[in-house]
Amino acid sequence: MQSVPTIHVWDLEPIIQSEGHASFPIANREITFELKNSHERMYAAKCLLKVRHPQSDVDSLLFKRFVKQGDRVLDAGANIGYTALTFLLRGAVKVVALEPVPYIFERLNALASNDLITVEKALSAEEGQTEIVLSQSHNQGSSIKPELMEIFPEVYGAELKKALINTTTVDRLVDEHGQFDVWKLDIEGAEIDALRGASNTLLSSPPRLIFAELYADALVTFYQLVSATHPYMYRALIDVKSYQLHLCDPTLQELEPFYQTSPMYVFSQEEIKD
């Protein structure tokens, strides 16, 4: 029997409508995607068809493997709410989702309910206000960290657009919402600041797992700050041949067997057998 060819979401990109909206049910509510944004077109294609999108599937496979029934999750950098809903779909009973950019938060907040608490703030080392530089290429990537603009100048444009946003800390969120079993930190370079605002929580009630997207030298500093509670660190990658999730040595240099996706790392209190 002839095998059915694997379809990746980029195979469909030329024929996916690039304007208008598409809505799909996830975790007992409806999320709407704006098709002008490439990553939202990819989400829509995933919801409609059984297609592969390694960039977002790293998250999906991590959540499927590690989120337990009854987990309470901190989703920092929640964007429009796709990852927050995926956490709920995988068994989380409560997700506290942070998104500081006002026009994106409006969309996230439309999904709010008893099990999805939305917060219009950015994680940082302290409570207050700061400037965020807005992404001009799509609605992902806005950052409060100048070093990220050096890594991805095409995202922010020649003339930077800024907005004043509110900040909070992990310690404050735990005081307000209780402890979390899982943290997801995808906050465009502010992950170290987030840990510095989590010092009390890491001592008293650390999460079982931390998922964090980390660039450049941030990985070393991040690990130094969590190693006392989360001594096991892994790079999450998807194998090209099997499309299975692998948790690899973070120093791995030979990445050819894997899809090239954003550097997502897993920090665990206990050793994980791949």
Which role fits each region the language model picked out?
Residues A44-A45, T130, G141-E147, D274:
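Short, charged, solvent-exposed linker or helix-capping segments at domain edges/interfaces
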Residues F105-G141:
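Core alpha/beta nucleotide-donor-binding catalytic domains of modification enzymes
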Residues A78-Y82, P102, A125, I187-G189, ...:
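Short, glycine/acidic-enriched loop or turn micro-motifs at the edges of active sites
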Residues Q129-L134, S143-K145, Y223, H246-C248:
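Short aromatic-enriched loop/helix-cap "lid" or pocket-rim segments at secondary-structure transitions
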Residues L48-R72, Q129-E131, P146-S205, D217-T221:
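Short internal loop-to-helix segment that lines adenine-nucleotide cofactor pockets
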Residues K94-A97, R172-D274:
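Conserved acidic-Pro-Pro-aromatic motif
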Residues M1-A112, E154-K161, D175, D239-D274:
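S-adenosyl-L-methionine
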Residues T118, I132, I144, M233, ...:
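Generic preference for hydrophobic
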